């Protein structure tokens, strides 16, 4: 685990302990059970791909540790609607406060403004956080293999499945990819960002894609800025992307989303 992830784990475990003291496990489980039914995150991505289009997980992210503030004019419901209008299949919403200035209400409000499924983008170290995610309305969770061992990854995934959620399993290298493939989830995300240098390279997705069987849905994450980047990854049978920063910085988020997905600013007439 990188030094960055160790620091994140330390404050996350403090957060989890405080959350459990404030809302006991039995209570968060009850809230998760009472939440609206999951919308089908994987199903939404697969539907886009079956229609011959790229599938986009559009990220709502106010800030990041490496780039600082990304968008000052930050309105999660409006951003969610802009992404939906631009053709996104799903949302990813940051809920981590210390590193990303995220919040649970960003997820809840963004999802309520659209019909798209939403992923809780956060660092998960306890199944409690999965119940938390469902209680907030999340349809999917992220499991970062660089930050968890196999037993914890399996426990997080099992909790998500128990709640009818999907799990995006994130990998950065060959060893993590091999571990991810032992899990049941068909959603494998390849993060093109090196967690030690913070540099991004699409070569990471191109390299690791060769290890992943065809029955899994590959998602390329980070470092995707243009339609040409999407076309480049398509050559490796990757047609699903998670994009945040490059869209969040645009004045017209809907047009930027359309250009990324289709190369054109105007919506195609169907």
Curated annotation (Swiss-Prot):
GO molecular function annotations of the record: indole-3-glycerol-phosphate synthase activity; phosphoribosylanthranilate isomerase activity
Keyword Protein biosynthesis among record annotations: no
One GO biological process term: L-tryptophan biosynthetic process
Any Pfam family the entry gives: IGPS
InterPro entries: Aldolase_TIM (IPR013785), Indole-3-glycerol_P_synth (IPR045186), Indole-3-glycerol_P_synth_dom (IPR013798), Indole-3-GlycerolPSynthase_CS (IPR001468), RibuloseP-bd_barrel (IPR011060)
Pathway recorded for this protein: Amino-acid biosynthesis; L-tryptophan biosynthesis; L-tryptophan from chorismate: step 4/5
Keywords: Amino-acid biosynthesis, Aromatic amino acid biosynthesis, Decarboxylase, Lyase, Tryptophan biosynthesis
Enzyme class: lyase
EC numbers, comma separated: 4.1.1.48
Keyword Amino-acid biosynthesis found: yes
UniProt-listed SUPFAM superfamilies: Ribulose-phoshate binding barrel
Catalytic reactions of this protein: 1-(2-carboxyphenylamino)-1-deoxy-D-ribulose 5-phosphate + H(+) = (1S,2R)-1-C-(indol-3-yl)glycerol 3-phosphate + CO2 + H2O
Gene3D superfamilies: Aldolase class I
Family: Belongs to the TrpC family.
This protein's name: Indole-3-glycerol phosphate synthase
Gene source species: Mesorhizobium japonicum (strain LMG 29417 / CECT 9101 / MAFF 303099) (Mesorhizobium loti (strain MAFF 303099))
Gene that this sequence comes from: trpC
């Amino acid at each position: 685990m990188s030094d960055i992830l160790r620091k994140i784990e330390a404050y996350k475990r403090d957060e989890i302990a405080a959350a459990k003291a404030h809302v006991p496990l039995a209570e968060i489980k009850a809230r998760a059970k009472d939440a609206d039914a999951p919308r089908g995150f994987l199903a939404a991505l697969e539907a886009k791909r079956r229609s011959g289009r790229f599938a986009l997980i559009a990220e709502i992210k106010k800030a990041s540790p490496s780039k600082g503030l990304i968008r000052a004019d930050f309105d999660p419901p409006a951003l969610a609607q802009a992404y939906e209008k631009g053709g996104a299949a799903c949302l990813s919403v940051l809920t981590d406060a210390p590193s990303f200035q995220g919040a649970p209400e960003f997820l809840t409000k963004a999802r309520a403004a659209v019909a798209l499924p939403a992923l809780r983008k956060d660092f998960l170290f306890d199944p409690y956080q999965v119940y938390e995610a469902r209680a907030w309305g999340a349809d999917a969770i992220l499991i970062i293999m660089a930050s968890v061992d196999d037993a914890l990854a399996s426990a997080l995934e099992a909790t998500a499945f128990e709640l009818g959620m999907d799990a995006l399993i994130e990998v950065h290298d060959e060893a993590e990819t091999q571990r991810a493939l032992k899990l049941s989830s068909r959603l494998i995300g390849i993060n093109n960002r090196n967690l030690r240098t913070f540099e991004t390279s699409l070569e990471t997705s191109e390299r690791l894609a060769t290890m992943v069987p065809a029955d899994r849905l590959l998602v390329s994450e980070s470092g995707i800025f243009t339609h040409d980047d999407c076309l480049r990854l398509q050559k490796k049978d990757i047609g699903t992307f998670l994009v945040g920063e490059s869209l969040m910085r645009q004045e017209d988020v809907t047009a930027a989303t359309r250009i990324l997905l289709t190369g054109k600013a105007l919506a195609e007439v169907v």
